[in-house]
Regions:
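Glycoside hydrolase catalytic-domain context in secreted enzymes
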Residues: 1-418, 424-437, 443-610
Length: 610
C-alpha cells in the first residue's frame, strides 16, 4: 500500500503467509497450518507466531497474510494444508495463538478467508450455502476467537459467495457479524481481484481492495458519490478503519525493518524444527517395527530427496532444505542409509520442441488475446520455453480477466514414446494434437479444469500440439505436463532386498496440492504402483506421507509395517522424520482431521462439485 506523505501515512508492506514470510526471497519455512494444528500445542504455536513476526520485521514487512482459518471440509481442497483442521475449537485456539505471536512483534496478522472458502474448485463463482447455526458452530469460531481474544488487526474476505452474496461485498459478514456482533475494529481487505460491484463494496464491503483499485477506483467512486449512489460517510468509515489500525501499530512512528534481527534466524529455525517434531503423526506401527535404531536402510520415493510443501501463495522458498534422505544419512552412525532415486520423468514439454512446422525455431509460440474467445489478431505474440501463463504480458496491474491464450509447438520424437499427458487450467481449455481435438472442458469461470490422456508417439512422426485457454474471472493458470508412466527399475532390486528397513516417501507436493486447484483423494499417479514394486522385494516398509489432509491408504496400508503422516513439515522436516524413525524422539502429533477409508465416506463427497 503506497504512502500518502501529505497525511503522514507510511507505505505498508504485505507478505503472503501463512507458513513463512513469502517475500520474493528465502525465508524460514515452518510446518504448514494442518501440521501446526496436529501439535495440539498452543504455546508452541504462539512461539511460531513470534518467529514469523521476527522474520517479517527482518524483511520490513508490516502485514503477514495469515493465518488461514477455514475449516477442513473435504480432503480434496487444494489449500487444506494452510488451514487448521476440521475441529472449530482447535482451529480457534491455534489461530488465536498464531495471531498473538505475530502481533507481539509489531506485525499485523491477517486472518483469512472469511468465510466458507472450503474448496478451490470454482472458488470465484461457487456459493457456500450455509445456515446460520452451522456458520456459528463450525465456520465462524476460529475467526471469532481471533477477533475477540487475539484482537487480530486485519481480516481477508474469501473468493466464494456466501449464501449467494460475494464475501467481499456482504453486509452480513462485513457489517453485521464482524463489526456488529464481534466488535471488530480493524480493517477488512479483499483477496486478490475478488471485488465485483463498486456500489456494494462501497456500501457493505471491504475497506481495502487488493491488489489495486478496480471497484475502488477514485474516479469511479467520486462519480458515484456525486450521483448520490454512494454515501461519502461510508467511505470515511473505511478510511478510518485503515488509518486507525496503522496508527495503533505505530507504523507512522518507526521503521518496520528491524536490522537487529537476522533474516536467517537460528531461533526461528529451532522453532520450525520443534514444530516438525511435534506435528508428525504415527498412523501405524506393526509389532513395534519402529524405532529402527541400527542396520541397513533404503530411502526412496518421489518425496525422499526434496523439501515438500504445498503450492500457490502459501509456497515459501526455504532458507535450508533438509530432506528425509539427508536426515537418514546423517542421523546416526549405526544407520547405514542408501538413497535410491525413483525412476520417473515429468516435464512441461516432451523434449526439444519447435515453434514452427519447419522445425527451425526452438520454443513454443505463445499468443495472448484481449478477449475470451481467441478472436481477431493476438495482442501479444512471442516465443517462450514453456506452456504457462506470463502474468505481466498486459502490464503489471492488469488482472488478466476476459483474456485467452494459445500455445503451439511441434515435436518429432527420436524413438517410440508412451506418455501420460496432462493439462491443468482454471476456466476452460481446448487441446489439439495434429489439429484434432483430444481434450476439452467447458469454458467456465474459475472452474479449475484438468484433463488427462495416455499418448503414444512414434519415432520420426511430426506432432503438432496446441493448447487454447480462456480466463474469464479470477487468477489465471494454464499448465501442460508430459509424464513417463512408471516403469519398475530392477537395477536397484538387490539393494532394496538387502535392506532391513525401506523408507518410502510418498504423497502430494506443490505440483498436486495447491491454491486454485483441488487434488485427488488417492496418491498421485504412479505412486501406488511404485510402492507395490518395492513391496515385491521387501516388506519391511515404512511409508512417510506428505499432504494437507486425508489420503487413501486402504489399497496398501495392510502391506506395510509403519505409516507416518508428516504433512508438510517445513525446512527441518527431513531431520524430524529421521529422528522419529530412529527413536531419537517419540511421535507426538495428533490428528486434527478424520481420515476416510474411501472418498465416499466423506459426507460432502456426493455434492462437492455442485
Amino acid at each position: 500500500v503506497r504512502a500518502i506523505d501529505r497525511l503522514g501515512l507510511p507505505a505498508v508492506r504485505m507478505a503472503d503467509g501463512p507458513q513463512g514470510v513469502r517475500n520474493n526471497t528465502k525465508s524460514t519455512l515452518y510446518p504448514s497450518g494442518i501440521a501446526a494444528a496436529a501439535t495440539w500445542d498452543i504455546d508452541l504455536i504462539q512461539q511460531m507466531g513470534v518467529s514469523l513476526g521476527k522474520d517479517a520485521r527482518a524483511r520490513g514487512v508490516h502485514i503477514l497474510l495469515g493465518p488461514g482459518a477455514n475449516i477442513y471440509r473435504s480432503p480434496l481442497c487444494g489449500r487444506n494444508f494452510e488451514y487448521f483442521g476440521e475441529d472449530p475449537f482447535l482451529a480457534g485456539e491455534i489461530a488465536s495463538a498464531y495471531v498473538k505471536g505475530v502481533q507481539s512483534m509489531g506485525v499485523m496478522a491477517c486472518i483469512k478467508h472469511f468465510a466458507g472458502n472450503n474448496q478451490e474448485w470454482a472458488r470465484h463463482s461457487v456459493s457456500s450455502d450455509i445456515d446460520e447455526r452451522t456458520l456459528n458452530e463450525i465456520y465462524f469460531p476460529a475467526f471469532e476467537k481471533a477477533v475477540k481474544e487475539a484482537n487480530v488487526a486485519t481480516i481477508m474476505t474469501s473468493y466464494n459467495l456466501l449464501n449467494g452474496v460475494h464475501a467481499s461485498e456482504s453486509k452480513y459478514l462485513n457489517q453485521e457479524v464482524l463489526r456488529g456482533q464481534w466488535g471488530f475494529d480493524g480493517f477488512v481487505m479483499s483477496d486478490w481481484v475478488s471485488c465485483y460491484s463498486p456500489v456494494n463494496v462501497a456500501r457493505w464491503g471491504v475497506d481495502l481492495e487488493m491488489p489495486y483499485a478496480k471497484c475502488q477506483d477514485p474516479k469511479l467512486i467520486k462519480k458515484l458519490v456525486e450521483q448520490g449512489v454512494i454515501d461519502e460517510r461510508a467511505l470515511d468509515k473505511k478510511c478510518q478503519n485503515i488509518i486507525q489500525t496503522i496508527f495503533a501499530f505505530e507504523f507512522d512512528k518507526r521503521e518496520q525493518l528491524d536490522k537487529s534481527l537476522p533474516a536467517n534466524n537460528p531461533e526461528c529455525d529451532a522453532v520450525a524444527h520443534k514444530l516438525s517434531q511435534s506435528a508428525i503423526v504415527m498412523l501405524k506401527n506393526e509389532n513395534n517395527f519402529l524405532p529402527f535404531k541400527k542396520g541397513k536402510v533404503v530411502v526412496c520415493g518421489p518425496n525422499a530427496d526434496k523439501i515438500v510443501t504445498g503450492g500457490g501463495s502459501g509456497f515459501v522458498t526455504p532458507l535450508i532444505s533438509y530432506s528425509v534422505a539427508q536426515g537418514m544419512s546423517e542421523i546416526d552412525k549405526k544407520i547405514k542409509s542408501t538413497f535410491v532415486p525413483m525412476v520417473a520423468d515429468s516435464r512441461p514439454v516432451p523434449g526439444v520442441v519447435y515453434a514452427d512446422k519447419a522445425l527451425t525455431q526452438k520454443g513454443i509460440a505463445a499468443e495472448y488475446y484481449t478477449n475470451p474467445e481467441l478472436e481477431g489478431k493476438p495482442a501479444h505474440s512471442f516465443i517462450t520455453d514453456k506452456v504457462g501463463i506470463q502474468e505481466n504480458v498486459f502490464g503489471a496491474h492488469n488482472d488478466m480477466v476476459n483474456v485467452s491464450t494459445r500455445h503451439t509447438f511441434y515435436y518429432k520424437p527420436a524413438k517410440d514414446e508412451m506418455y501420460h499427458f496432462t493439462v491443468n487450467t482454471n476456466d476452460g481449455f481446448r487441446c489439439y494434437i495434429n489439429d484434432q481435438l483430444v481434450m476439452r472442458d467447458r469454458w467456465h469461470k474459475d472452474s479449475n479444469q484438468q484433463g488427462y490422456m495416455e499418448l503414444e508417439m512414434k519415432a520420426g512422426q511430426l506432432y503438432k500440439f496446441e493448447l487454447q485457454h480462456q480466463n474469464v474471472g479470477g487468477s489465471i493458470n494454464a499448465e501442460m505436463a508430459f509424464e513417463l508412466p512408471f516403469v519398475e527399475d530392477n537395477s536397484m532390486a538387490k539393494t532394496i532386498k538387502e535392506a532391513e528397513c525401506v523408507v518410502v516417501c510418498l504423497g502430494h507436493s506443490k505440483l498436486s496440492e495447491k491454491e486454485n486447484s483441488d487434488r485427488t483423494f488417492g496418491l498421485p499417479r504412479g505412486q501406488v504402483e511404485y510402492l507395490e514394486s518395492i513391496l515385491k522385494h521387501n516388506q519391511n516398509v515404512v511409508v512417510v506421507l506428505n499432504g494437507g489432509g486425508a489420503i487413501e491408504m486402504a489399497p496398501w496400508m495392510d502391506k506395510v509395517k509403519a505409516i507416518l503422516m508428516a504433512w508438510y513439515p517445513g525446512q527441518q522436516g527431513g531431520l524430524a522424520i529421521s529422528e522419529i524413525i530412529t527413536g531419537k524422539i517419540s511421535p507426538s502429533g495428533k490428528l486434527p482431521i478424520s481420515i476416510e477409508t474411501k472418498l465416499e465416506d466423506n459426507p460432502c463427497s456426493a455434492n462437492y462439485h455442485e
